[in-house]
Amino acid sequence: MNDNDVSSYYKEALATDSFTVHNNFLNMLLKNGSALGMERHYCYFKDSKNADLKRILGNGFLKRGKEGVLFLEEKLKTETDALAKSNVIHLIGLSYNKEYLPYILPYLDDADNEIRYKAIIACGWLGDAEAIKILKEHYATEKDALLRGFIVSAMRQIFFRHKETKQQIVDFIYVKMPEETYNELLAIMIVVLQDLTKVKFGLKEDSCSGEISGDIAKAKDKVLKKIKK
């Protein structure tokens, strides 16, 4: 199939929400495992303004196995667009393979907030108890309060796979919460505590949207009283 045919199928895929059309286009790209074929795949992924198609094309790199992830790792070194780089970090995180965590760690200190956000989340998907230590260290230097909240959320993701991390996460939150004042960060800390300890402090987290509701001040007060016991 020549370049014009692929381009034509891409335009067709862009113009529809059909999963079948999107998946067929991905399968067409996956037939070419050469460096040029993966580069073409990446260009279409990066270019797509169709969110459904973009998601399918992104996940397609994981279908390429280790070669696909290694290609993405090389893209992290050369990609100059911050949003595109953050999307690549996200995809590597979705591999859920600890082997690829070292690719992500340098971006915890990136100047761009979106890149740091995706790196934090990816650490939660890829990491284990050792990654908890890394996230604790990053928490101390992260100036964005909401991103500090996502660090705590990433710790919870690690807990879901590694239950032995529970106490060190709980202890960390107990130490850090009294000094925090940003409501969104406090809300994340509290719902994570609720998940890990099974103690209800008065907040609810929507399982679909992640939106947190409830009286944060009252919930924080309940946590602080528990800490002082």
Q: What function would you assign to each model-found segment?
A:
Residues Y9-Y10, R40-Y42, F71-E73, Y103-L105, ...:
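Buried hydrophobic core positions in alpha-solenoid tandem helical repeats
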Residues D17-S18, K49-N50, T80-D81, A111-D112, ...:
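Short inter-helical turns and helix N-cap capping residues of alpha-solenoid HEAT/ARM repeat scaffolds
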Residues E114, I132, Q168-I173, E205-I216:
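HEAT/HEAT-like alpha-solenoid repeats
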Residues Q194-K229:
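Eukaryotic acidic, Ser/Thr-rich intrinsically disordered low-complexity regions
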Residues M1, K11-E12, F19-G33, C43-Y44, ...:
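Structural detector for internal amphipathic alpha-helices that build alpha-solenoid repeat scaffolds
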